[in-house]
């Protein structure tokens, strides 16, 4: 986002293109993450993205692809994410009878969850762009649909931040709750975490360093909380994954379940 922004004369000319390059690198990491999630889910007959996080991601991509992104490259990026989300969603639906046997209402309501996410993202975007200058700092040089004072970068930061929080915290919580690595892997964790760092935190950090008058939101206490929580969850995740893999059981069909009595019960059902 922010590809058409016009920074003040004292800002180095390379800052805005570099921030967009970081965003693109983060987007590619997430593309790889979605592909890995789909393959791992198919192989282990499970899912690797928490339902709430998946619903928020899809809804965020829909709203930005349809209503916010202006440049062809931006639209292509959001549409690519949406297309890559389809196999991840399919894998989640396939795994629902087994993974959500204890909560069938959750498994049957992914579409309403996406709809609510779309409504929330659309409402926030409508409020944010209702008047020029909304947000943190001086929005001179921030352009959207030919009008100055509308900061797509800040809008994307806040809305993506909520989605990132649900992904990072949700994936960690899911690992604790399920006690197995079905649907996930170290590679998925790495590309997901790198995508968060490069695509969400990196661009805004760079812009704040060189163009602080328009990007003060980066050091807002709420923003610091969101980033710190996401990074902490992502740093803890591989350590928890290592412990989980020591006790999990791989079944003959490739499925992975928690060790102990749960694994014995699952094996008994299969036989």
Regions found by a protein language model. Name each.
Residues 1-271:
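Alpha-helical membrane-protein topology signature
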């Amino acid at each position: 986002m922010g590809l058409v922004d016009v920074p003040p004369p004292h800002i180095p000319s390379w800052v805005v293109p570099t921030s967009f390059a970081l965003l693109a690198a983060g987007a590619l990491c997430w593309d790889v993450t979605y592909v890995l999630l789909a393959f791992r889910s198919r192989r282990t007959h499970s899912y690797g993205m928490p339902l709430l996080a998946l619903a928020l991601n899809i809804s965020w991509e829909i709203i930005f692809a349809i209503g916010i992104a202006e440049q062809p490259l931006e639209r292509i990026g959001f549409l690519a994410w949406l297309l890559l989300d389809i196999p991840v969603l399919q894998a989640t639906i396939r795994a629902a009878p087994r993974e959500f046997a204890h909560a069938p209402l959750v498994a049957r309501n992914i579409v309403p969850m996406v709809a609510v996410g779309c409504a929330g993202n659309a409402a926030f975007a409508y409020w944010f762009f209702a008047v020029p200058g909304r947000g943190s700092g001086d929005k001179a040089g921030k352009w959207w649909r030919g009008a100055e004072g509308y900061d797509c970068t800040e809008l994307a930061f806040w809305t993506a931040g909520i989605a990132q929080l649900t992904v990072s915290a949700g994936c960690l919580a899911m690992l604790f709750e399920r006690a197995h690595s079905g649907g996930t892997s170290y590679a998925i964790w790495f590309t997901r975490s790198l995508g968060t760092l490069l695509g969400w935190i990196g661009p805004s950090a760079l812009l704040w360093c060189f163009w602080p008058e328009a990007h003060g939101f980066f050091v807002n206490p709420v923003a610091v909380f969101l980033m710190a929580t996401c990074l902490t969850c992502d740093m803890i995740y591989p350590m928890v994954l290592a412990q989980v893999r020591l006790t999990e059981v791989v079944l003959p069909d490739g499925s992975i379940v928690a060790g102990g009595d749960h694994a014995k019960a699952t094996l008994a059902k299969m036989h």
